[in-house]
Amino acid sequence: MQVTLAALGSGRWDTLTGQVQARLLQAQCILGAPRLLADLPAECTKNRIAATTANQLLAAIRREELERSVVVYSGDSGFYSGARSLIPLLEAEKIEYTLLPGLSSAQMLAALLGRPWQDWLLVSAHGVDCDPVAAVMQGRPAFFLTGGALDPATLCKRLVEAGLGQLPVTVGENLYRPQQRITTLTARDCVEKRFAPLSVLLAEAAPMPPRRSPGLPDSAFVRGKVPMTKQLVRTAILAKLAVAPEHVLWDVGAGTGSVSVELALAASRGRVYAVEYKPEALDLIRQNREMFHTWNLELIPGRAPEALGSLPAPDAVFIGGSGGAMDAIVQAALEKNPRVRLCISAIALETVQAALAALHARGIPTTVTQLAVSETRPAGGLNLLMANNPIFLITGNCDD
């Protein structure tokens, strides 16, 4: 028994490779999605079996027991193809198979646009969740296979919510088929449109600032009258939290958003949730987010812990202000992730005491660090060393 896993691209016969065409014409049985089977020419066998899941396909192959069976897939067999689910089952049954390529939707769209695609970030949103904001923040165009709940309009809605409404996007519908349509517009305009089920989305790279190490100058932020965590302290916070590019992070009591911005720059493929209830502070966070293009920074208006309930589980949490609810905030974070890394800043001894009590009550390994930073300031013809207020960083689960 020989099984061929053949990729058909858009399904149009004249775009198939000669090898795929030959296997289809020689096949005794062809299996696959109904749409692909319907597109096959009359010269191909009439023994066509509609099946989509790997288990359905394997059962049909075993039942038919024919010498030459062909399983057809849309797009390319190596590009988010269902073939990858069937191959392990065939190998387990010791059934010989051949994998044949086809045109992927990324190749089709690139050719129609007259653009190279080797630098595109390729993302599947076909029946699975994805983060379009993180995707467009990688410094290159992001191509999305869409389907199910995540159609182009839904993906663009997420971009708009992140402040990327003006980002140029292109939607390709029914590529290489009679109903083909290509539309270029902004993400905001895309939200109001409806597209065919067979659609793909190409989003251009989001504007991003030059990359640099943590510790942005204090003068770079819009500050207003809201207290701001200083440069060297922010650097220490990021070191304590050991932020990775894909992390989900909370900044509770975000203030101006200076820590939120630093976290978002470090977690460029992740997500940062800045929790703050003061209107003036929320406005400053918005301004700083736009200034630094940290589109993966999401504002959560409200008080903690109430505002934390709907947030995804964090990898690390910074608590810069608790509003007297330290114990409840720590508990909320631990309920989402028992191994979450915690860093709490404090200038008052009472806050240190509350943080230690909350962590010790739960048996969390704890470290207290005091930072006392002094900087030179000119006074007449002299440079005097002036001390900033000492600050404590109380950390939990940060020893590994």
What are these regions (language model features)?
Residues 1-98, 103, 107, 269-272, ...:
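Class I S-adenosyl-L-methionine
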Residues 277, 282, 298-375:
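S-adenosylmethionine
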Residues 256-268:
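Conserved SAM-binding loop of SAM-dependent methyltransferases across substrates and taxa
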Residues 246-255:
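Conserved class I S-adenosyl-L-methionine
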Residues 1-7, 18-21, 51-52, 66-69, ...:
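A contiguous loop/helix-start segment that scaffolds small-molecule binding in enzyme catalytic cores
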Residues 176, 183-198, 351-353, 359-400:
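Active-site capping/gating segments
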Residues 12, 75-139, 305-306, 362-386, ...:
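Class I SAM-dependent methyltransferase SAM-binding "motif I" and its flanking Rossmann-like core
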Residues 265-272, 336-338:
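Conserved S-adenosyl-L-methionine
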